Amino acid sequence: MILICLCRQGFEKEVAAEITDCAAYAGIAGYVKTNADTGYVEFVLPDLDSATALFEAIRFDDLVFVRHWFVTPAIASDLPKEDRASPLMASAQALPPLAKLEPITLDTNDGKALVALTRGVTNHMRTVFKKAGAFNAKSDWVGQVLFFSGEQACIGYFPQSNGSLWVGGIPRLRAPKDAPSRATLKLEEAWHQFIPREQWDQRIAPSMRAVDLGAAPGGWTWQLVNKSMFVEAVDNGPMAENIMASGQVTHRMEDAFRFAPERAVHWLVSDIADKPARVAELITRWAENKWFKEAVFNLKLPMKKRYIELQLCSEIITLALDNAGIEYTLKFKQLYHDREEVTGHLVLF
């Protein structure tokens, strides 16, 4: 059995390190196979029981660099152009009952070129499955069809209760026309990732007070204003005029690393481009003073040792809060709209 882990192109090494560490901690044997810039990693498992144990032991939401995952019995090669579906149908005999079957693609130029082929083959297989009565709407397993090239593909499955919110791990969010930058989508995606949709009305509510550190030109502030919050935007740079015209934003032209709020707020957000450890220390200072209830922040990772750097930044925050006796939850995720960075979510209790 092979666990396929999809990721941002160029982050295969980080995924390999992360899934190896998580599997080892759970006592699950396996080894990685990876190629640079392919957008995926293979984690080879000894048998079906190991795959089942892995899904039970590792929570997908605890993984940072893995965008999406599923298990496949094997990767089929040398698929005939006249009938690519039959070899995949044969491989599907080893799968549990599926609730549905989805086409997914790698987030690379080669992967995008295979969208039409993947959809066509998947639609054909769906028709065959439906005629055979093979789908079970009550099943937790979702089938996946992925093409690596025109001649190589696989069919696999993952549990709906322990996987990505989005098909293939890619969200379908539209950039608002009046937002000052596309960075606004990072915060929107972060809310989807870290906060259950049914809790939005309580946790992302109108009239809440928020601080945006390093706010200019206002991509993240726009999201807060759009949720009818009152925002202190901290940045020496200029803010977009339409955001300031809302009447909900106070522009503090100060150094984000030195700013201290006059009173605690509900939301702290930050997309500062600085050394990740320095940003982690900034978030820690705010947390130790209990100046917020929830925070979303980005850490810009270095080109080398990104996985190690993230662990160090996480330790900066957790060690300080543990020593202070503060209850919290801290999670990280490399979002689809992130680049050489990861997004953190810290909740204080």
Curated annotation (Swiss-Prot):
- According to its UniProt record, which residues of this chain constitute the active site? 300
| Any one GO CC term of the record | cytoplasm
> Which terms are listed as keywords in the entry?
Cytoplasm, Methyltransferase, rRNA processing, S-adenosyl-L-methionine, Transferase
The residues listed in the UniProt record as binding S-adenosyl-L-methionine, with positions renumbered to this chain, are 216-219, 235, 255, 271
**A single BP term in Gene Ontology:** rRNA processing
Q: Does the keyword Glycoprotein apply?
A: no
Q: Which Gene3D superfamilies match?
A: 3.30.2300.20, 3.30.70.2810, Vaccinia Virus protein VP39
Task: Write the Enzyme Commission number(s) for this entry.
Answer: 2.1.1.186
Predominant cellular place of this UniProt entry's protein: cytoplasm
Query: GO molecular function: any one?
Result: S-adenosylmethionine-dependent methyltransferase activity
Query: What reaction does this catalyse?
Result: cytidine(2498) in 23S rRNA + S-adenosyl-L-methionine = 2'-O-methylcytidine(2498) in 23S rRNA + S-adenosyl-L-homocysteine + H(+)
Q: Does the keyword Thylakoid apply?
A: no
Instruction: Tell me the compartments it is located in.
Output: Cytoplasm
The protein's matches in InterPro entries, at most eight in alphabetical order, are given as: RlmM_FDX, RNA_MeTrfase_FtsJ_dom, rRNA_MeTrfase_M, SAM-dependent_MTases_sf
Q: Which HAMAP family did the record assign?
A: 23SrRNA_methyltr_M
Q: Which family does it belong to?
A: Belongs to the class I-like SAM-binding methyltransferase superfamily. RNA methyltransferase RlmE family. RlmM subfamily.
What this chain does, per the record? Catalyzes the 2'-O-methylation at nucleotide C2498 in 23S rRNA.
Q: Matching PANTHER family, A to Z? A: RIBOSOMAL RNA LARGE SUBUNIT METHYLTRANSFERASE M, RIBOSOMAL RNA METHYLTRANSFERASE FTSJ DOMAIN-CONTAINING PROTEIN
Quaternary structure per UniProt?
Monomer.
Q: What is the name listed in the Swiss-Prot or TrEMBL entry for this protein? A: Ribosomal RNA large subunit methyltransferase M
